[in-house]
A protein has these predicted regions:
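N-terminal Sec-pathway targeting helices
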Residues: 1-15
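Polar/charged alpha-helical tracts
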Residues: 5-6, 71, 75, 127, ...
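Hydrophobic membrane-insertion alpha-helices, especially the h-region
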Residues: 12-24
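Membrane-interface motif at the C-terminal end of an N-terminal transmembrane signal
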Residues: 22-33
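Amphipathic, positively biased hydrophobic alpha-helical segments used for protein targeting
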Residues: 23-25, 114, 255
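Acidic/His-rich structured neighborhood in mature extracellular/periplasmic domains
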Residues: 36-184, 199-202
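A cross-kingdom marker for long, charged
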Residues: 168-169, 178, 184-261
């Protein structure tokens, strides 16, 4: 994959739009999950305060960029929230941003050994250059720098495998190359869930649940046209990449994919 610095900047700015995309507009509809598997509870734990302490999230900047945080969201960032992670349209923006921060900063085999590791223009991608709510710099300053989670080698392996085979309708890149906010966020979510014991099947279901939350129109289309797909199949390049969705789903379903949610 070859790209010049200027081309990378143009791509990143085109994806991010007017700056950091924080999920100011959430499309209507609940997540659509064909072939749903019941998932174990997932918890934030001390992820929030660890991200804040590392400077990946500056709470004041995040509040300003998003127009404010709820009391529950503030409690999550302080580490005072003890309930399960809620996954619904009201939580969509906060999930996107917090998982984005985690996927960006967490030291991982995906970032250290995947295509991002040799991508010279990584600092100018939407997932890095678009992250402007860190304390000390843009997203590339934190990229693959912090041990927020302590993943075992087996957990790293399962995340790498699922990241290699999950796509998003805004581009043709797998989660293994998290070049936008959605890719980085899904990586962070997979890492957190794997660290809490999720197996491969459960990770695919979680990934589909989140993707369908962030791209509701696209996954409504997939569910309507291909109701019998497993989560792993629905997330494959054939259906969930931009070109795959356009080829196999868009002919029958109106919709569009954008990192601007």
């Amino acid at each position: 994959m070859t790209i010049t610095r200027n081309e990378a900047i143009k791509i990143s700015l085109g994806i991010v739009g007017l700056g950091l995309i924080i999920g100011l507009i959430i499309q209507k509809g609940e997540p659509v999950v064909p072939g749903q598997v019941n998932l174990p509870p997932l918890y934030w734990g001390d992820i929030g305060p660890r991200l804040v302490s590392a400077g990946v999230i500056d709470v004041v900047k995040l509040e300003k960029a998003t127009g404010g945080l709820s009391d529950e969201e503030k409690a999550i960032l302080k580490g005072d929230y003890r309930g399960e992670i809620k996954i619904g349209k009201e939580e969509s923006g906060f999930l996107l941003n917090t998982f984005w921060a985690l996927g960006l900063a967490q030291k991982s085999e995906v970032l250290a050994q995947g295509p991002m590791s040799s991508f010279e223009a990584a600092a100018y991608l939407a997932s890095t250059g678009g992250w402007t709510v860190g304390r000390d710099g843009a997203g590339d300053y934190y990229l693959n720098k912090h041990q927020i989670l302590n993943l075992t080698p087996e957990q790293e392996k399962i995340v790498y495998g699922v990241a290699s085979n999950t796509y998003r309708p805004c581009c043709d890149n797998p989660t293994l190359f998290p070049d936008c906010n959605h890719g980085a966020a899904l990586l962070g979510a997979l890492e957190l869930a794997a660290n809490q014991g999720y197996n491969e099947e459960q990770l695919y279901t979680l990934a589909l649940r989140l993707n369908s939350l962030w791209f509701p129109g696209e996954y409504q289309g997939i569910a309507e046209k291909f109701p019998d797909l497993s989560p792993k199949e629905a997330l494959s390049a054939e259906y969930s990449s931009y070109s795959g969705w356009q080829k196999n789903v868009a002919a029958q379903v109106q919709g569009g994919a954008s990192c601007a949610i």
